[in-house]
Amino acid sequence: MARFEEQKLYIGGRYVEASSGATFETINPANGEVLAKVQRASREDVERAVQSAVEGQKVWAAMTAMQRSRILRRAVDILRERNDELAALETLDTGKPLAETRSVDIVTGADVLEYYAGLVPAIEGEQIPLRETSFVYTRREPLGVVAGIGAWNYPVQIALWKSAPALAAGNAMIFKPSEVTPLTALKLAEIYTEAGVPDGVFNVLTGSGREVGQWLTEHPLIEKISFTGGTSTGKKVMASASSSSLKEVTMELGGKSPLIIFPDADLDRAADIAVMANFFSSGQVCTNGTRVFIHRSQQARFEAKVLERVQRIRLGDPQDENTNFGPLVSFPHMESVLGYIESGKAQKARLLCGGERVTDGAFGKGAYVAPTVFTDCRDDMTIVREEIFGPVMSILVYDDEDEAIRRANDTEYGLAAGVVTQDLARAHRAIHRLEAGICWINTWGESPAEMPVGGYKQSGVGRENGLTTLAHYTRIKSVQVELGDYASVF
């Protein structure tokens, strides 16, 4: 018996039945409980959502900037009023501790929406003088209908990161949440409607990426795809978006981010950063600093400090306010992470702690994996090369700065990087050489609304958040005006 009623699609400002008649289940990873049956959208449903978005976008774009701004600001207020309710639902669906979802997921998503709500009236063109009798002006116009495809690790936050700039710029969005964690995106659709967003401007279609995601990516009336997920899937989405109708794309993809701890670093601070960069949200964060480079002279002291902090991790029931480490998001993902851990053991990385599924008592019903630290890792190990997306830290030893930078950059990814040092010149010198789109000095993990987020290399295309993102949800129209005579050559 599912905890919640069957979840429908959200099209045109209301819940509607999927025409497919098919459903899938969403599971609480803490105990295997079926939370709800969720309806699976068909190609016909995608078409309904697109047509609804086309009509809704016309109404939305015709509003004044101040009208749109006020409506989005009202949605921010509702999000904050319902923070605890949404956090509780997010915890059930993702397995994240309630202490985390209450303080991070909805809070940071609402911050992004508030940021873009304030920027709506600032979307403007420019005037370019040509000569006394002629000038050019530009208009920033919405793209039209755009699609967002979300990942399972930050469901409502990602939905807000994608919809906030899209709606602020006057677009309509069709959002497809991950099949694994679909519930809070539907609640966000309710909130937008309650705030006054016109029907059709934010639709939610649930289903698989192979079907619903592909149909959205191919649709000729969709002007842009914003995707968060794995690199291999991102490449397919990008290829389909280009071949179908030359859609614009934003891709926030995988990472294998380096954290370099220099010999002069405060090791207590470095250990705090390393543990947060690997075990917050049970290691399911795309920017995690999973390759931890420590100078040979500091290895033993650093490892001891890391182990001391791992002992403070409170693995438990996500509903318990004292828990700060929950299960992985699903049982299939747990098996994937355990497979990587076995690979690390087989390739002779030295296991400092963890390395197994947690099955004591009630934990045996959930997708729990112990915080795991490997050391004496080599650059060619699978756990060092590939994104694991779980609570697995790899410690690597280096001898000098040039070596650390070279090895840190020796990856197909370039999402994030960080350094810990008390030498300001060294910090900036190293950061300027690191090939990553998001970098931190003496900290890790914060991604405020004002900060553009995105990767180098195979970690993505484009950016989310910040001023630059708003521009990518508009297109520029250039208009020349001639006030004088027109000179024809004929």
Swiss-Prot record:
Biological or metabolic pathway of the protein: Amine and polyamine biosynthesis; betaine biosynthesis via choline pathway; betaine from betaine aldehyde: step 1/1
CDD domains: ALDH_F9_TMBADH
InterPro entries, per the entry: Ald_DH/histidinol_DH, Ald_DH_C, Ald_DH_CS_CYS, Ald_DH_CS_GLU, Ald_DH_N, Aldehyde_DH_dom, BADH
UniProt: K(+) 2 binding residues: L246, K457, G460
Modified positions (Cysteine sulfenic acid (-SOH)) in chain numbering: C286
Site (Seems to be a necessary countercharge to the potassium cations): E248
Described purpose of this protein according to its UniProt entry: Involved in the biosynthesis of the osmoprotectant glycine betaine. Catalyzes the irreversible oxidation of betaine aldehyde to the corresponding acid. In P.aeruginosa this reaction is a compulsory step in the assimilation of carbon and nitrogen when bacteria are growing in choline or choline precursors. Can use NADP(+) with similar efficiency to NAD(+), a property that can be used by the bacterium to produce the NADPH needed to combat the oxidative stress imposed by the host defenses.
Assembly behavior: Dimer of dimers.
Family: Belongs to the aldehyde dehydrogenase family.
This protein's name: NAD/NADP-dependent betaine aldehyde dehydrogenase
